[in-house]
Amino acid sequence: MIDFSEDLLPLSGLQHFAFCRRQWALIHPEQQWQENLRTVEGGLLHRRAHDEAARERRSDTLILRGLQVVSHQLGLSGQCDVVEFHAAPKGVPLQGEEGLWQPYPVEYKRGKPKSHQADELQLCAQAMCLEEMLCCSIPEGALFYGEPRRRTVVLFTPELRETVRRDSDEMHQLYRRGHTPKAKPSKSCSACSLKELCLPQLVRRESVQTYLRRAMEESP
């Protein structure tokens, strides 16, 4: 696998990429962004997760919030909402702590579990970062959704891991090329925070910046 040590992309972009490659390109390479109710609610949920004590002990579980992670193999870096470390005989040592600990990443999301795998891919990428950093194996983690307010366990299967690797590689290829995929309108577009910038009804191959620049040049 290629080592992306000098070319790290935001891990959070993996979720955008899995949901819509054009959305990812608008947010990251083109740095376009718009807030809507969904993104505001999602941001509040993440802030609540990070606002609590960054380090907490509950019996035989150590809870870390806002933990920075990186994978040079995937070329991704980011922040985990919560990583639980459970005391385990086959875990890993942690600085300042006695015994061995098994990492268990938990990601907070608004709404309900989705029909696509975007959330699962982001969580799996976090686990793969932790595995690379701690030299350990993490078989599963959990997604906590805001509406049902309960956890959904995610198994990090070989298939899910391979999708993370493939999408990460494709993200780097598109980023290096500066390419923004053309719009492919779908029912998901109505809730997208970038629908006004993306202009999916035009189904253009050009980037948003190119379109806006051309529109300004053509205006009287």
Predicted segment positions?
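Metal-dependent nuclease catalytic cores that hydrolyze phosphodiester bonds in DNA/RNA
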Residues: M1-P105, R205, R214-P220
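Short, intrinsically disordered, charge-biased short linear motifs at domain edges
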Residues: F4-D7, E170-S186
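Alpha-helix initiation and N-capping motif
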Residues: L11, R22-Q23, R161, S168, ...
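Residues that form generic nucleotide/phosphate-binding pockets
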Residues: F17, H28, T163, D167, ...
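Cysteine-cluster motifs in flexible loop/terminal segments that predominantly coordinate metals
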Residues: C20, H179-P220
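Noncatalytic linker/hinge segments flanking ATPase motor cores
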Residues: R55-R58, Y145-R151, T180-K187
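Nucleic-acid nuclease catalytic cores
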Residues: S77-G78, E84-R177, S190-E196
